[in-house]
Regions:
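N-terminal nucleotide/polyanion-binding subdomain common to many enzyme families
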Residues: 1-55
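Short gly/pro/ser/thr-enriched loop/turn and capping motifs at secondary-structure boundaries
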Residues: 36-38, 136, 158-163
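Short, flexible loop segments at boundaries between secondary-structure elements
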Residues: 102-108, 150-186
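Short Gly/Thr/Asp-enriched flexible loops that form oxyanion-binding sites at enzyme active sites
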Residues: 85, 138-147
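Conserved beta-alpha
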Residues: 37-123
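A short helix->loop->beta-strand "cap" motif at the edges of active sites that frequently abuts
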Residues: 69, 148-150
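A transmembrane-helix-recognition feature enriched in membrane-embedded lipid enzymes
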Residues: 35-42, 169, 173-197
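Proline-aspartate-enriched helix->loop->beta-strand connector
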Residues: 120, 124-134, 150
Length: 197
């Protein structure tokens, strides 16, 4: 599984050793935040740049559109998934989408987890994109990816950003580490607890 780590998830991992283990045991953890990539550069990783969930997802999708790679999408609401599918079909018409399921917005039972993994295995998915929000999505990927052959990728709000449901921050805000403020202004109820704590 692959995680995208930002300041919020870094602080959460520092405070919660179980979640820290989830982040540390991932196949790859992307620096999804300018502060993290800046620290990496200062620590000697001169080419470390910011890699956001939406950017990474769209790059992988673009690179695999005309290949045999199969994609499965899990998370967000049905309405937002429909918007994502509409966008992907319009912009990547040859992309192989083999499954798409909304979040149930509650923990899955063991039976539901097993059935989800069975559906993913039956679909022969190569990539499982998960949008449940941190830290839930990373824990979800760490737990369930063991039961499939697919690469699970936790991408948070990427479904909603890529589809245009939630607009991306202007480039100048991204360049000045202010994307969090823009996102907070667009989703104050959802993000209040994250940014105030």
């Amino acid at each position: 599984y692959i995680c995208a780590c930002n300041v919020h998830t870094t602080v959460t991992a520092h405070e919660n050793l179980d979640y820290q283990a989830v982040q540390n045991n991932s196949f790859m953890t992307l620096p999804d935040g300018k502060p993290l990539s800046s620290v990496g550069v200062r620590r000697g990783y001169s080419e470390m740049g910011r890699v956001t969930g939406p950017d990474f997802m769209e790059q992988v999708i673009a690179a695999t559109e005309k290949s045999d790679a199969r994609h499965y999408f899990y998370g967000t609401t049905q309405k937002n998934l429909n918007a994502l599918l509409e966008y992907l079909k319009a912009n990547y018409p040859q992309l192989s989408i083999v499954g798409c399921e909304p979040s149930l917005f509650r923990p899955l039972t063991i039976q539901e987890e097993t059935e989800l993994c069975d559906r993913i295995n039956e679909s022969k998915a190569d990539f499982v994109w998960v949008a449940l929000g941190a830290p839930r999505q990373e824990k979800f990927c760490a737990k369930l990816s063991k039961n499939t052959k697919a690469v699970w990728i936790a991408v948070g709000g990427a479904f909603n950003v890529i589809s245009g449901v939630i607009p991306r921050a202007p480039q100048w805000m991204q360049d000045h580490s202010l994307e969090w403020l823009y996102r907070w202004s667009k989703e104050p109820k959802r993000l209040f607890k994250r940014y105030v704590e």
